[in-house]
Amino acid sequence: MNDIRSRKIAVLMGGLSAEREVSLASGAAVCQALVARGFDALSVDVARDLPLVLSREGIGAAFIALHGRYGEDGCVQGLLELMAIPYTGSGVLASALAMHKLYSKQAFVSAGILTAPFHHFRRGERVSLSHLSFGLPLVVKPVQEGSSVGISIVKEESQLAAAVKLAFRHDDEILVEQFIKGQEVQVGILDDRPMGAIEIVSRNEFYDFEAKYTDGMAEHFFPARLEKGLYEEALRVGLAAHHALGCRCYSRVDLLVTPAGECYVLEVNTLPGMTALSLLPEIAAKGADLPFEELVERIILSADLSVKTG
């Protein structure tokens, strides 16, 4: 929308999810960048009075810097659609699909995109190796959480019960996936084009919450250490996953690239982190020569509504 520069912008941050602290850091960085680029922006710590706050402050556009439940799952997007406030990132449906790991995996399978074999369980259902079509090792995760919250790698049968209990602590539905061994590669998307792919080598067993948000807990390699043809394939698969869910403007797609050269999609992050340690800003800077402030400006200028009214 061409008149975004003249509007008062709310940077939506914090919120009610398990990723609240990360969101506060993302929001603070985004708000500072918007002000530095000359926008009239204020930070809003999202609570249940959000509609009143947006109306009272005369907000004309929103930069969504929320992560996890209520912010990344289509809830806030639906509210902003009802209030006719243009917002950044994907719309209601794409946000909900990306946040729900079962439905996103089904969309990937339908689009011919590789994703790890999986089984879905609801609270109260028995989870045992005999119920699975694959063996150890495996991954147990909540259906709807981000930042690797509630995820476990299970290498021995004795670890399964604790992993299932942890995942159900965060959701009423869980996925049990076949463990795929490979390089952890993340593709950054902006304006519906891939900017590049970065490789992550975690000091922990996998790229978990601690490794994502603690300085020094992971090494980053840009571009990802893949031969040229495989690197291009990773970019293609990342963009295909973005499109398979109907995402808008920007996202970060997490992949595993196997020694056999297969690219498995883990998930699509419709509202990737925007902190000093976050991967999308690093990919933008190194892959598209786009400093953080310019990245934030590009994103806010893409703010829009999915439902157009006359």
Swiss-Prot record:
Q: In which pathway does it act?
A: Cell wall biogenesis; peptidoglycan biosynthesis
Species name: Pelobacter propionicus (strain DSM 2379 / NBRC 103807 / OttBd1)
Which BP terms from GO are recorded? cell wall organization; peptidoglycan biosynthetic process; regulation of cell shape
Residues that coordinate or bind ATP: 133-186
- What is this protein's name? D-alanine--D-alanine ligase
Catalytic activity reported: 2 D-alanine + ATP = D-alanyl-D-alanine + ADP + phosphate + H(+)
In this chain, Mg(2+) 1 is annotated as bound at 254, 267
A Gene Ontology cellular component where this protein is annotated is: cytoplasm
Q: Which domain of life is it from?
A: Bacteria
Which cofactor is essential here? Answer: Mg(2+); Mn(2+)
Please name the SUPFAM superfamilies in this protein's record: Glutathione synthetase ATP-binding domain-like (SSF56059), PreATP-grasp domain (SSF52440)
Binding site residues for Mg(2+) 2: 267, 269
Extract the Pfam families matched here: Dala_Dala_lig_C, Dala_Dala_lig_N
Q: Where is the ATP-grasp domain?
A: 105-301
Mention one GO molecular function: ATP binding
Q: Any keyword Aminoacyl-tRNA synthetase? A: no
Entry note: cofactor: Binds 2 magnesium or manganese ions per subunit.
Keywords of the record, alphabetical order, are:
ATP-binding, Cell shape, Cell wall biogenesis/degradation, Cytoplasm, Ligase, Magnesium, Manganese, Metal-binding, Nucleotide-binding, Peptidoglycan synthesis
